[in-house]
């Protein structure tokens, strides 16, 4: 039975049996057989239990490693297409975490790291694949941009800052960080500027590749605690990067030409040459599927760096159909996100099929892939999202092809079933 503050037990002042506060100092006293507990102590007990559950749950999760089939199924929920890349990633990630579970090698056989290199055009889903895997496995995830990295001692971001970012994501818990995933984007931008090693120092190209070598392969990185600056008297956090999965991604623009040059060597010229017609020409995506390590060396990555990324997955360019699917099918599809926003205003949002096709066509024209879809939808809905909170009785907003093309405003359907075209201010 709960005792409200101010209600005495026969005029007697009551106190919490745990913290000793009187009924006048708390909002609620709950009575038991000859004991009382206040609302503050109940809340404190709840917090303690919640913290203990959080500490136990990661250990329980570790016992259950999703199979490659399960990982692939999770990726299918969020990422459209890229079937071959999903399969490659699912197997590589499964093997990596299996290696961590069985740290003591049998018969002296040490398992190597399965770091991954993703090659694919902008907006094809490289980052999303890595991010989704980290979310499924409930491990810390961080992203780094290779273009901002420089060798230690030069102006720019030190490669060890990547590990610091990962630690920040898990409140500087080293054990958690060592099970994390790091995605390094724009890795193609740190390619060597020419095939021949230069006399001058290439601090943002080959120099960064050299600096990343040890980090990706596995080393003990010394990171200052809580993001402080390094100084000699400081105690560092020691992070073993051999347990961290590194995924590197890049568009590698022009790599298809390198592959074609290799493939066409020895085809001959003159009367004996084999003439290729239009039907024999391959798309860039098809050509990239034939990539070999030697092509990446020719492109500008050093052999040692390529050797640290043994798993190679190629992503294809997204066509109109794939972009339409991305707009509406995944669990967190863009149209579903905006529909949820409109639902908060008690308004239904509908995208007609012709609108989805027009949005996909716009993204293809901009050559931004899936990455550009959100900004297009934001632009289409800007005026209506501005006006809607101040407009009464709107039950539904309909977006069709003409709205996407800017030829008309969204159709508003009011609660009394009247349809009206919105007028943009």
Swiss-Prot record:
GO terms for molecular function: ATP binding; ATP hydrolysis activity; ATP-dependent protein folding chaperone; protein dimerization activity; unfolded protein binding; zinc ion binding. It holds the Pfam family AAA_2. ATP binds at residues 121-128. Zn(2+) binds at residues 16, 19, 38, 41. GO terms for cellular component: HslUV protease complex. GO terms for biological process: cell division; proteolysis involved in protein catabolic process. The keyword Transmembrane helix does not apply. PANTHER family: ATP-DEPENDENT CLP PROTEASE ATP-BINDING SUBUNIT CLPX-LIKE, MITOCHONDRIAL, ATP-DEPENDENT CLP PROTEASE ATP-BINDING SUBUNIT CLPX-LIKE, MITOCHONDRIAL-RELATED. NCBIfam families: clpX (TIGR00382), PRK05342.1 (NF003745). Component of the ClpX-ClpP complex. Forms a hexameric ring that, in the presence of ATP, binds to fourteen ClpP subunits assembled into a disk-like structure with a central cavity, resembling the structure of eukaryotic proteasomes. ATP-dependent specificity component of the Clp protease. It directs the protease to specific substrates. Can perform chaperone functions in the absence of ClpP. This is ATP-dependent Clp protease ATP-binding subunit ClpX.
